[in-house]
Amino acid sequence: MTIYRFFKRSAFTLAYIYRRFHEEGCAYRATALAYTTLLALVPLTIVAFTLLSFVPAFQGVGVRLQNLIWENFVPTSAGMVAAYLSQLTQNVTGLSIINIFFLGIVALLLMYNINRAFVAIWHTEHHFRLSLHFLIYFMVLLLSPFLLGAVMLLGTFLVQSPLVTDLIGWPYLGKGLLFVLPYVLIFITFTLFNWVLPSAKVKLSHAVIGGLVTTVLFELAKFAFTVYLKFFPTYRVIYGALSVIPIFLVWLYVSWTIILLGAVVSNVIACGIPEKYK
């Protein structure tokens, strides 16, 4: 009887999560975020590279940070986008302050749309003016490259320390750490999404569960996406050399769908299921 009740409750929970995902229009929001991300990706990268270039200690950190993101958050099949993005960011030295300012506006709009999607899922309202929100987004955009750059430098320092070098040198422990570390990075990223972006007081435990669900689904999607493109190269046959654009756009849509689904999971765990749906 206990097992039956467990499966029954799990079925109701999954059904309600699907219902909430549909009612909040997450599929449509994922579509909008995918297009916005595609448009804002280059501006975000250029702004980050420009800010990091002002600090001599961060020379070369931008490229390493970019490679870290591409290696962990994009399937191998869509990795050609990284090469195109690297070529585009090489033109950053030829941009004026005004051009960089407008690129920053595009990046701010992406941050605003992401925040609005999480706010809609959690049914929270902003209590500040729109101008204040964009000021907050601007501060985040301004400080994030330096914080991430500092984390990269700290990580490099730790990896080169004698203790970590000895641990990595161990036959099984070293390989285990190198295998687990990318998943931990992805898990922390998605947990922070669910903890910070809803503009509400979210318990860390609820954000952790949502981050864990998102991480598992994200990794499964990466594997399935790579397998699909390998054995069913439809986009490459149709679009040829231009296939990198629709392939990457589809991956962005899948990614945002999973991220928003994780946000719904966090919200359902935090707020529970209403009696009328039980």
From Swiss-Prot:
Membrane topology reported for the UniProt record: Multi-pass membrane protein
Pfam families documented for this protein: Virul_fac_BrkB
Subcellular location(s) of the protein: Cell inner membrane
Transmembrane segments: 38-58, 68-88, 92-112, 134-154, 177-197, 207-227, 244-264
Keyword terms of this UniProt record: Cell inner membrane, Cell membrane, Membrane, Transmembrane, Transmembrane helix
Cellular component GO terms held in the UniProt record: plasma membrane
Alphabetized InterPro entries for the sequence: UPF0761_bac, Virul_fac_BrkB
Family to which this protein belongs: Belongs to the UPF0761 family.
Protein name per its UniProtKB record: UPF0761 membrane protein CBU_1578
Originating organism: Coxiella burnetii (strain RSA 493 / Nine Mile phase I)
